[in-house]
């Protein structure tokens, strides 16, 4: 996918969430977004990550993605991301210790 197409789909995605799925009470599933935008789940996650990096308040929970309505929703997603970071770091550290033992 070329850069211009990526930007267009990101803009459309962000606008779609902001207009139709605001707040944690109104999430949309990844499967629904995949069908609407004709992309796979990995591309949905890439789009969400890119938009978050640009400062868009795209949040998520077990029920799906949504455009944040308030700071509490943003804080909940930040906490979720922080927890994932810690778990990934623990997995990395476990692999590093295994690699060090074999050296």
State what each model feature region is.
Residues 29-36:
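A short acidic, leucine-rich amphipathic alpha-helix
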Residues 61-70:
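Minor-groove-contacting beta-hairpin "wing" of winged helix-turn-helix DNA-binding domains
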Residues 1-16:
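Short alpha-helical segments that sit at the start of domains
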Residues 97-103:
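Exposed, interaction-prone assembly regions rather than primary DNA-binding/catalytic cores
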Residues 19-25, 54:
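Short helix-capping/hinge SLiMs at alpha-helix to coil transitions
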Residues 52-62:
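A short, conserved structural fragment
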Residues 39-50:
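Short amphipathic alpha-helical interaction segments
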Residues 73-95:
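Short, amphipathic alpha-helical interaction segments positioned at domain boundaries
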